[in-house]
């Protein structure tokens, strides 16, 4: 009993520590990328090329004096950011970083991620209401309305993916893309899902919950020092999680190009032009297969690097969108969800099963 608990704790640490480190470096990447787009240098003093800037900022916030409003509900004021951070990190428990490389790869993984991401709304609502501030309360209401609305967009887009794969299990969704990634037959759905992900994570141009010109800093206006770090980590943790989920649903997750196929392709070219002989190929092929293909450690690293690379590209798109587009009005944001995205998704939900059924490729467990 105790042994299994210790193993579970080790698994949680092995997943969350790299995730938190990745979140820290996403903040640095965002600042450096936006600086490059705006012809600035960005952070470049703390550490080599500014690589330790996030840790310096975290230390600064941890050492700051914590101040709370006198009329605030102190317990809920502290509890709101903690709840938001916990639910933003719970989604990492079902992410498969490779075959059988997940804390708990159970059959309802997609449903679980949608559930815990929607529960983070309670933390934002508690934080805004308990601060006893008009700006914080209005920001929390805006954020709640936005998250609930775009949760429908994400759920509807995921439903279209499930129609192709026939499962709510993340690993099954990845393995079903060995022939072709879902982004190719479902490109419009991918675009809608990406837009919904940007809105779901309160990122520009959909960051209406913390619009500086209207709400000072939204639901986190009164929070400072350590509890502000919780909100900060929760926001960027949600960004990384949504990018990983997008790469799993549409970009094949940890699946990469078969290295043996690439090897055979280049060998056939070199052999046909007489650059190498057959004996050299057999020796090199044997060592290559033993070191890179049959080695479970190397294979696991390749899986992790693959899903990390795909997620990094999507994170860059998040940053690119933030640096390129102006903030829209809140009524435009909600109208775009309810009058454009959702009707379009409902039309696709009706159209896609008809196409799949007419070609007899609808998964059996969806019928």
Curated annotation (Swiss-Prot):
One of its GO terms (cellular component) is mitochondrial inner membrane. InterPro entries: NADH_UbQ_OxRdtase_su1/FPO, NADH_UbQ_OxRdtase_su1_CS. It is a multi-pass membrane protein. The chain crosses the membrane at residues 5-25, 43-63, 74-94, 108-128, 152-172, 179-199, 225-245, 265-285, 301-321, 336-356. It holds the Pfam family NADHdh. It catalyses: a ubiquinone + NADH + 5 H(+)(in) = a ubiquinol + NAD(+) + 4 H(+)(out). One of its GO terms (molecular function) is NADH dehydrogenase (ubiquinone) activity. Its main location: mitochondrion. Its EC number is 7.1.1.2. It is found in: Mitochondrion inner membrane. Keywords: Electron transport, Membrane, Mitochondrion, Mitochondrion inner membrane, NAD, Respiratory chain, Translocase, Transmembrane, Transmembrane helix, Transport, Ubiquinone. GO terms for biological process: aerobic respiration. Belongs to the complex I subunit 1 family. Core subunit of the mitochondrial membrane respiratory chain NADH dehydrogenase (Complex I) that is believed to belong to the minimal assembly required for catalysis. Complex I functions in the transfer of electrons from NADH to the respiratory chain. The immediate electron acceptor for the enzyme is believed to be ubiquinone. This is NADH-ubiquinone oxidoreductase chain 1.
């Amino acid at each position: 009993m105790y042994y299994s608990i210790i193993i579970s704790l080790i698994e949680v640490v092995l997943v969350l520590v790299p995730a938190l480190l990745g979140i820290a470096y996403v903040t640095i990447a965002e600042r450096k990328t936006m600086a490059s787009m705006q012809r600035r240098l960005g952070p470049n003093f703390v550490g080599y090329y500014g690589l330790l800037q996030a840790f310096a900022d975290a230390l600064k916030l941890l050492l700051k004096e914590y101040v709370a409003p006198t009329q605030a509900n102190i317990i809920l004021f502290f509890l709101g950011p903690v709840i938001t951070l916990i639910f933003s990190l719970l989604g990492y428990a079902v992410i498969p970083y490779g075959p059988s490389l997940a804390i708990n790869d159970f059959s309802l993984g997609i449903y679980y991620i949608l559930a815990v991401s929607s529960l983070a709304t309670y933390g934002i609502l508690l934080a805004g209401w308990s601060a006893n501030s008009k700006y914080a309360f209005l920001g929390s209401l805006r954020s709640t309305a936005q998250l609930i609305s775009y949760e429908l967009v994400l759920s509807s887009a995921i439903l279209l993916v499930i129609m192709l794969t026939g499962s709510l299990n993340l690993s099954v969704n990845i393995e079903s893309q060995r022939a072709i990634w879902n982004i190719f037959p479902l490109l419009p759905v991918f675009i809608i899902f990406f837009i919904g992900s940007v809105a779901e994570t309160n990122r520009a141009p959909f960051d209406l919950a913390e619009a500086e010109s209207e709400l000072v800093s939204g639901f986190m206006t009164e929070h400072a020092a350590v509890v502000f770090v919780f909100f900060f980590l929760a926001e960027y943790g949600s960004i990384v999680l949504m990018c990983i989920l997008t790469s799993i649903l549409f970009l094949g997750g940890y699946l990469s190009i078969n290295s043996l196929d690439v090897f055979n392709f280049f060998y056939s070219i070199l052999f046909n032009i007489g650059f190498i002989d057959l004996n050299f190929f057999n020796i090199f092929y044997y060592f290559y297969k033993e070191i890179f293909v049959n080695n479970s450690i190397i294979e696991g690293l390749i899986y992790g690097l693959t899903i990390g690379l795909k997620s990094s590209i999507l994170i860059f798109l998040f940053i690119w969108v933030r640096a390129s587009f102006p903030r829209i009005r809140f009524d435009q944001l909600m109208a775009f969800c309810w009058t454009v995205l959702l009707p379009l998704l409902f039309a696709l939900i009706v159209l896609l099963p008809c196409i799949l059924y007419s070609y007899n490729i609808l998964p059996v467990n969806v019928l």
